[in-house]
Structures are given as C-alpha cells and as structure tokens.
C-alpha cells in the first residue's frame, strides 16, 4: 500500500489585480513585471475573507471530488503562513466548519515549500495505516502581509488555496520519493520584518531557489529509480518564471512539461504548488500512470521535492 491523491479542489478570490492596476498604485509597469517575473495578474481576497475561508472552500471541493464526505476524513493538514491567530489552527477551523467530527487537524509551516511538507507528512500516516483519508491544504492570504510600498515585492504576491485528499493506493502508484530540507542560516534573506510585512533579499533567494530546487529534483528522481525523461509533468513553486525555467532546464525537459500558473495567480506561497496541481488536473495535463514532480522553496530557508505517480 502507498499514499496517493484521490481528489483535488481549489479556491481563488474573485478580485483580480492586474499589472496595469499596480501601475496606478506605484512606480512600475506591466512590461517590467512581466519580463522579470512572468506575472500578469493576481487574486486578492476581500478584507473580510480570511485564510481559513480560502482553505475551507478548497477542502470542500477536494472532498467532493474524491467521492467522500467530511465524516470520512481522518486528518486535516494545512500549510500556511497567514493564520489569523497562533491558535486555533486553520486546520481546526475548517474541520469544524465542514463538520468533520472524526478528524484531527494541524497546521504546518514551511512557507512556500509548505504544501510539499504537508503531502509528505500525510503520506506517512497513510502508509503506516494510522489514518486512511487525509486532506492537505495549501492556503495563504499574502495580501495582508505584503508591503505595498515596496515595489520589488508588492508585484509578486497573491491569495488563494489548493487542496487534495490523500488516501491508500497501490504500491506502484502514489508518492514514490521525496526530499525535504532546511537551511536556517538563510532565514535573514526572506522573513517578516518588524512591521509584519514580507522582506526579501531577491538576489540571495534566487540563488538558493535555483540551486536547491535543481538538486532536490535530481535526488528524488534517483530515489524513485527514474530518469529525467520519465517525468511527465514538472510543477514547481510559482514564484518567478526565471526560477521555474531554470528548474525545467536543469532537468532537460521540454517546455510543454512545465506547468505554469504564475501569470494568473502570482506567488501564493503555501498554496502555489497546490493551485498549479489542481489546474493541471482540471486542464487534463495529468493522466493515469504519469510521473509528476512537485518542487518548491520557501522562507526558512526551506525546500521540498516529491514525485507522485498518478492513479490508484
């Protein structure tokens, strides 16, 4: 028995903030943003719309798509950096709102790599037989911690949530390998400043991301006994098109094997990889027996990579 994906779901706020909107808010341009990041627009949550609202909507859809009910869920794991409070956790809030009376809940925090940490954590519970059905959510409302006076970072971030239901699958499907890591010495390069807004040293973060995402991708391939050409789809953290393209080139993959959503969502941190995965499923980019590589990096500094073989 292995742990695989049974259903997916997403939620993005209605409001779209385009690069042209940002031109009216700060000294920037659509051309400057697109050429450096690949971002054209991002979603922004309402003031009265919170991270747990985004997570709830995505989880609800994922459970329905898995053909399950909330009472079938044993555990909720939410990856986020924008909890409204230290406690209760976002996972506990959505567990209550969904009426999932049989489920436990906990949040995990590894910034933009958080979803990969959540997936790997869920897989361990399933593979040991401790739990059967686990909802893993990546959700963030980055607009509330964005410094809108810093054009270098304000143009990057958006809000949203992606969710999956994980459960038992056959031994030759599901999670084939993973690589999680941290380099705490780099925490000074990406963090919340004294005003609780995002600070980023873009140059240092770029170097870290390109190096670690590439190396982690090669490690999970080796651990899964796969070659680069065995990969059917690469879903990287949607931070910056240049970082994403560097990851693709490191693996010698053709352009069509790179999943891109950065243009329409921007960088949504914990939900970035999850949203891209859900879009890939909805667009028919993933079919049974496909080998899918998820890889990301985040504040901490952290990184996570994993390979899933699609299907049951």
From Swiss-Prot:
Its EC number is 2.3.1.180. GO terms for cellular component: cytoplasm. Residues 238-242 are annotated as: ACP-binding. Its main location: cytoplasm. It is an enzyme of class 2 (transferase). Pathway: Lipid metabolism; fatty acid biosynthesis. It comes from the Bacteria. Belongs to the thiolase-like superfamily. FabH family. The last Arg residue of the ACP-binding site is essential for the weak association between ACP/AcpP and FabH. NCBIfam families: fabH (TIGR00747), PRK09352.1 (NF006829). This is Beta-ketoacyl-[acyl-carrier-protein] synthase III. It comes from Listeria welshimeri serovar 6b (strain ATCC 35897 / DSM 20650 / CCUG 15529 / CIP 8149 / NCTC 11857 / SLCC 5334 / V8).
């Amino acid at each position: 028995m292995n742990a695989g994906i049974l259903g997916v779901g997403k939620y993005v706020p209605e409001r779209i903030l385009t690069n042209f909107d940002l031109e009216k808010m700060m000294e920037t341009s659509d051309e400057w943003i697109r050429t450096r990041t690949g971002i054209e627009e991002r979603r922004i949550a309402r003031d009265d719309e919170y991270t747990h609202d985004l997570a709830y909507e995505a989880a609800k859809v994922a459970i329905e798509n898995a053909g399950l009910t909330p009472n079938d869920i044993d555990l909720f794991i939410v990856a986020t950096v924008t909890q409204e409070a230290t406690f209760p956790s976002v996972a506990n809030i959505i567990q209550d709102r969904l009426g999932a009376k049989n489920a436990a809940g906990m949040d995990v925090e590894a910034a933009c790599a958080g979803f990969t940490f959540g997936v790997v954590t869920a897989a361990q519970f399933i593979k040991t037989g401790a739990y059967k059905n686990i909802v893993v959510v990546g959700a963030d409302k980055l607009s509330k911690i964005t410094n809108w006076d810093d054009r270098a970072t304000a143009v990057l971030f958006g809000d949203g949530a992606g969710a999956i239901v994980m459960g038992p699958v056959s031994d030759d499907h599901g999670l084939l390998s993973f690589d999680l890591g941290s380099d705490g010495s780099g925490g000074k390069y990406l963090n919340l400043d004294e005003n609780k807004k995002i600070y980023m040293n873009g140059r240092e973060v770029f170097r870290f991301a390109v190096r670690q995402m590439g190396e982690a991708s090669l490690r999970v391939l080796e651990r899964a006994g796969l070659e680069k050409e065995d990969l059917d789809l690469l879903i990287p953290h949607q931070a910056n098109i240049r970082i994403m393209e560097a990851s693709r080139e490191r693996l010698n993959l053709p352009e069509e094997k790179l999943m891109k959503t950065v243009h329409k969502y921007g960088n949504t941190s914990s939900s970035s990889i999850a949203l891209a995965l859900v879009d890939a499923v909805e667009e028919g980019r993933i079919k049974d027996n496909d080998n899918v590589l998820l890889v990301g990096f985040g504040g901490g500094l952290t990184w996570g990579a994993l390979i899933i073989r699609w299907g049951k």
